[in-house]
Amino acid sequence: MNSSKRMSHCVQLAIIVALCAIARAATPTALSHGTIEQIEIEAKSLAGNQLGDPTTQKCLVYLPGGYAEHPDLRYPVLYLLHGFSLGSVLEDWGSVVTEAMDGFVTANPSQAFIVVIPNGANSVHGSYYLNSSVGGNWENYIIGDLVSSIDTRYRTIARKSGRAIAGHSMGGFAALRLAMLHSDLYNVAYAMSPCCLDLQDDFTSTNPEWNKVLALKSVADIRTAATENDFWATALAAFAIAASPNPKALIQADLPYREDEGRLVLVPSVVVRWKRIMPLDMIDDHQGELKALSGVAIDYGYEDDFSHIPDTSRQFGERLLALHIPVVVEGYHGDHNNQVPSRVGSRMIPYIAAHLVFQK
């Protein structure tokens, strides 16, 4: 090979190397795994709550592989709300998200996004992410304090098209509700096994667990029920504190049922308060907000432990379709929890990514 040909090949090789370097710099890669950070958020919205819960709240933040290597790149954010539990679930969700997101980002490096997992448990184990004169203004915390703090601390795409909200059980309830109320803030919602969509099935007086709730005489009794692993008594009482607070009541909340000669009867004024914040009953008044969302999805297990969840999930989807509002509702064989980790990676994350805007 003569010197001129060698020079030509060297120049071509140099150009190819330079172009590859430019491509690597412009496109995020998944050479490193994502990382989970635990941070504290100043929750001014919780100030003055009657349960004595702190105004500094723990939060997990998943940063995708490539976040540190690409300081000029901004990322969309998924706010993922956990469910009601008598134990700690935040760390479990951190592990699920890390595994699912690492796999997704490896396969789709141009669709990397941040995942924020805030604490939603108060001292009665569930805030339901609602504003409450007793439990504190958790809705305001999620949509205000939290979003503002994350947008300030991290390189986010700080607009509607760069935000998603999702959740499981209590968190699924909140994801649908907050998306309806704040469609200017979130672009897409995904609810996994969402509870509390309406006052049906095991939320009604046919559930004998209501007798345990009616027997509670104080907030301390609710906390005792939790230590005794009495899920229903704790969960229903906590929902009452969130949905129908009353500082003058024994458990600082009004209940939708009362006992009358050995049977449970409805308390209409409380039922109205509960149904006002239940997503299935909110649809008619929030059609415009639902239509403003890029996507709405629900999934649930056919064998869910809580009978109201499959029924109300289907009804929610049917109601939206009747109003010509696009929605995805998918049932599968599984209970309330056992398929959720795998479906985070196989269903939720790809759906969320398809409805977010990424920096080019």
Which role fits each region the language model picked out?
Residues 12-21:
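Bacterial N-terminal signal peptides
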Residues 26-360:
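Non-catalytic cap/lid and distal C-terminal segments of serine-dependent acyl enzymes
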Residues 1-4, 23, 349:
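Generic cytosolic/nucleocytoplasmic N-terminal low-complexity/intrinsically disordered segments
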Residues 2-13:
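Bacterial N-terminal signal peptides that target proteins for export
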